[in-house]
């Protein structure tokens, strides 16, 4: 049975500001099932931004576990991410989940994968999902050549990804921490 897939999630950090955004498209095979899904959330007392790509049910399961890890480790983003990645890699049921997460707080941005990777992106820019490469390339160009805010960069870069990737639409949700 096919899973719901297809999205673009992008995070841009500049100075003490971070923006995390995503599109709203959910795709089952080659059919758009929903255009307004919310794949970017605020968790842990609105102090942490999380965006997810991949299988929708898998992502929600991981998001719940990640929020529990944040509670357990008093909001320590890195520790919670490492603990989630360890569980994800070693637990037989979790290992089958197909999703990726980007998490950001006031000081740190991390990409968390099912391979047990917890990555701190270079240059404060990272993206996941089907349109991630397009969005990341656009964001890097905008960050290097303009004085736009992280929110403005995310908005423009997701627009470019939406123009190029058939699994990404222009219905964007963007959250910021300043």
Swiss-Prot record:
Family stated for the protein in its record: Belongs to the peptidase T1B family. HslV subfamily.
Encoding gene, per UniProt annotation: hslV
Location in or out of the cell: Cytoplasm
Residues involved in Na(+) binding: 162, 165, 168
Function, in words: Protease subunit of a proteasome-like degradation complex believed to be a general protein degrading machinery.
Gene Ontology biological process terms, A to Z: proteolysis involved in protein catabolic process
Signal peptide (UniProt feature, chain positions): none
Molecular function in Gene Ontology: metal ion binding; threonine-type endopeptidase activity
Reactions catalysed, as given in the entry: ATP-dependent cleavage of peptide bonds with broad specificity
Protein name according to UniProt: ATP-dependent protease subunit HslV
Activity regulation, per record: Allosterically activated by HslU binding.
EC numbers: 3.4.25.2
Catalytic center residues: 7
Organism: Burkholderia mallei (strain ATCC 23344)
Keywords, comma-separated and alphabetical: Allosteric enzyme, Cytoplasm, Hydrolase, Metal-binding, Protease, Sodium, Threonine protease
HAMAP family per UniProt: HslV
GO annotation, cellular component aspect: HslUV protease complex; proteasome core complex
Domain of life from the UniProt record: Bacteria
Subunit and interaction comment: A double ring-shaped homohexamer of HslV is capped on each side by a ring-shaped HslU homohexamer. The assembly of the HslU/HslV complex is dependent on binding of ATP.
Uppermost EC category: hydrolase
InterPro entries: ATP-dep_Prtase_HsIV_su, Ntn_hydrolases_N, Proteasome_sua/b, Proteasome_suB-type
